[in-house]
């Protein structure tokens, strides 16, 4: 710097900040000097009206001796600027705007710990260093003005957000503002000032031609200005300056990028134009210097001139984005839903697939842990050697598996073949389907997935169904609770745009996501075992899966078609997913079901495939006896009770014959025998429980949605109880009066409810049997109850009488129609005789039914 500047800087001896310019200080040092001061000064001197104001030409000797004599900002003067919004100029006073003296993007350095809502003027009161750049802008301004320029600086108004300051000065008579501006610019060219926060740019100065607006609003400078054209007089209209005029007015402040005028057909007033600079600092200079400037008439401003009103214009307004979003909900809401779905797929799907793999591999399960497995094996060996204990069979199922070894071998053979079809294990409840598949056939399979449809179907509501389906395959995280919230959002969106936005996913879509992620995990489990040096390394993934059916995981779908309805989304999605697994050679799929109509839903998924089916029935009496004896022997060996004597078990064969070969009933009897009951007592308990269940579910039930009637159920019970072979011909049942209308539907529903079972030959229904072997004894017990039997027989007779009366009514109506003819044609004679015979037969039936009904009523009145 020049000598004058050095003299001034060294005039204050005790000031540690005078040796170097505050503009060249680092941010940390500047902030430290500003905010670590002891206390704010108790008094400020207002330059306006102050006798100690100075000139830069010849400063008085005492100018820098006392800090109180420095011209500085006062809170009162700033309050007046913010209240009036303008800087008043008197005669011989001018105004300059100096740019790039405050860091616009580093205001936190100057504001310190102050809240953003407090004005900068409050910050100045808290700083005890008036010579610093942050507290006294005049210390910066004095380096801008050359020493030989005789001007008196009256006031400095900082514009922190814009990075500059207004300088109000007093000039001598005969000195023009343009001369002062030129002198300052020449001085800055010779002695450029580069602030510490932006050392690559210099401080710039321009004369203020308009009347700037001083405000403390939160308006961020931008390179784009909105220039509005206001009339110079209230009785006049503002002229619309040309592009050339605007260019000549604003080009001096910096490089212009574009000038965009208001469309000529626009009705918006006042008229405006957009002036865009190459950099924001040029726009800051232009706004502060040209705001309030009046274009003269000779320059195209009209008779009274055109005044400019300038504001910053953001290229993309947040309000514009908000307005567009609110005005286009049909586009925005579905787009947001799609974006959320895309983020979910991108972020969560790999995580969910990983957890499903963990579930399939079962690396966290105790039974799959190699270390614990080895320890368990060694302990088992020690027990065998030391105590002579053989492996126990707590349920005594060894006899059952020996009898069904052929089915187990057949199933294992199918799992090594490359056939794209389902494997169905069908059998009544309690026939041991799950144990046969999981404990025997798949005992040594490493990867298997078990899906229990009963748990999913019994869940209440879509949210619970989704959570249970996800839990069975390890699909997590699952935000099933979000579905309810999303449904409300969808409902609100439907009210706004008329259609659903897609925020909430239906049960169909959620299940599809779960099963699709499971399929991806199953495929990954197989392919993860591939190695580069395998002999099949040259095969593609699809070819590898097809070539190694023995490596595929096994998906077991238990309780298939449990509580199924005509249109069930759960079973529909499961069958579609299972068909995809088998078709893509990803996994073997085994269905375990008690429903005899399983072929119908499965054929929709694989219409051109023949399913491989294993039907599990009741075991033979010999196998049942061995099962019970093995169960009791194992209990005696592992427990404290002695084995039962032969005399105690003398009625075992007859009891097993009553129970048949149903595993669950045999096991229940074995448990009751272990508890101390005799075989006959255990069987009687089973019969009593089954009797109560049948009465509650089929006879005394008030369910109006059942597809059968109480009369139909009781008719079947009586006929099966009195049958010598324990079965009825299927067609004989359909020919009875109670089953003529909806006979097949009722029989299928009763079979589904497991009251009866229908045996087929070559796919055609042949015989009707009790649903369980023990049900034959139950049916006999029910028919032996005279009161119950009489009441239900009376209901059957009442229904038959009603049916015959309806038939007679139809016959009489037709006879009445034929009798109304003027002549009786000879051809109608046979028809009339047939109708009369029908009426006669129906009336005879009614008479017989009424006789039987009277007898039953008499029995009921007597109470036995």
Curated annotation (Swiss-Prot):
The RRM domain covers: 223-315
Spell out the CDD domains in the cross-references: RRM_Yme2p_like (cd12433)
UniProt keywords (A-Z) are:
Membrane, Mitochondrion, Mitochondrion inner membrane, mRNA processing, RNA-binding, Transit peptide, Transmembrane, Transmembrane helix
Location of this chain's protein in the cell: Mitochondrion inner membrane
Family of the protein in this entry: Belongs to the YME2 family.
- PANTHER family, per database record: MITOCHONDRIAL ESCAPE PROTEIN 2
The regions listed as transmembrane in this protein's record are: 331-351
Q: Topological domains (Mitochondrial intermembrane): residue ranges?
A: 352-864
Q: What GO biological process terms are annotated to this protein in UniProt?
A: mitochondrial genome maintenance; mRNA processing
InterPro entries in the record, alphabetically? Answer: Mt_escape_2_C, Nucleotide-bd_a/b_plait_sf, P-loop_NTPase, RBD_domain_sf, RRM_dom, Yme2_C, Yme2_RRM
One Pfam family this sequence matches: RNA12
Name the UniProt record assigns to this protein: Mitochondrial escape protein 2
Membrane topology annotation = Single-pass membrane protein
Domain of life of the native organism: Eukaryota
Listed GO MF terms: RNA binding
Q: What does this protein do?
A: Plays a role in maintaining the mitochondrial genome and in controlling the mtDNA escape. Involved in the regulation of mtDNA nucleotide structure and number. May have a dispensable role in early maturation of pre-rRNA.
SUPFAM superfamilies hit by this protein? RNA-binding domain, RBD (SSF54928)
Keyword Membrane tagged: yes
Q: Which Gene3D superfamilies match?
A: 3.30.70.330, P-loop containing nucleotide triphosphate hydrolases (3.40.50.300)
What cellular component GO annotations does this protein have? mitochondrial inner membrane
- The question of whether Transit peptide is a record keyword is answered with yes
